From Swiss-Prot:
Broad enzyme group: transferase
Organism: Coxiella burnetii (strain CbuK_Q154) (Coxiella burnetii (strain Q154))
Protein name as catalogued: Shikimate kinase
EC number(s) reported in the record: 2.7.1.71
Gene behind the chain: aroK
UniProt binding sites for ATP: 15-20, 123
GO terms (BP aspect): amino acid biosynthetic process; aromatic amino acid family biosynthetic process; chorismate biosynthetic process
Binding site for substrate: 37, 61, 83, 142
Subunit note: Monomer.
């Protein structure tokens, strides 16, 4: 059973729109949006690509686990997670137990388009030469984990972040009728 319905966590692959939708959710609910990758960068003073290069994926995942633990202790937040947050069992447990988990999905083509628009240097697991294959590989591993955690699922290929954020809030209130009372 959920211990805290005041937090909204956005999970899904890179390029699914977690930060865009999270920004709109934050505006609509007058809450702070946290992006776990950006919070790691703030704490370390280094970008994610550098952390991957210097510490490897294991070092980054350790930092991510520490950040998720800290953020899950907060109340009334919107959290856009990194795509790989679901790889760690402790992350999955903390996120699932402390808020409503929204899984945003996107086709591989949509992901490629969005990642290309933002630039890939910030995304260490996105490799230009075989990017489509890499995204498919990541999806095969992560999709079952996203699905297992999700309270609500939304495709974002035809994304209008504000409309989707509004629909998410309506669905949360309908699914968890006490949600509105707990956020006051």
């Amino acid at each position: 059973m959920k211990k805290n319905l005041t937090n909204i966590y956005l999970i899904g692959p890179m390029g699914a729109g977690k930060t865009s939708v999270g920004s709109q959710l934050a505006k609509l609910t007058k809450r702070i949006l946290y992006d776990s990758d950006k919070e790691i960068e703030k704490r370390t003073g280094a970008d994610i690509a550098w952390i991957f290069e210097m510490e490897g994926e294991a070092g980054f995942r350790r930092r991510e686990r520490e950040m998720i633990e800290a953020l899950c202790k907060l109340d009334n937040i919107i959290l856009a997670t990194g795509g790989g947050v679901v790889l760690d069992e402790k992350n999955r447990q903390q996120i699932s137990e402390t808020g409503v988990v929204i899984y945003l999905t996107a086709s591989i083509d949509t992901q490629l388009k969005r990642i290309g628009q933002k630039g890939e240097m910030r995304r260490p697991l996105f490799i230009k030469n075989n990017s489509k294959e890499k995204l498919q590989q990541l999806n095969e591993i992560r999709k079952p984990l996203y699905q297992a955690m999700a309270d609500l699922v939304y495709p974002t290929d035809d994304l209008n972040p504000r409309q989707l954020a509004t629909q998410i809030l309506v669905d949360i209130k309908q699914t968890y009728q006490t949600y509105e009372n707990r956020t006051r």
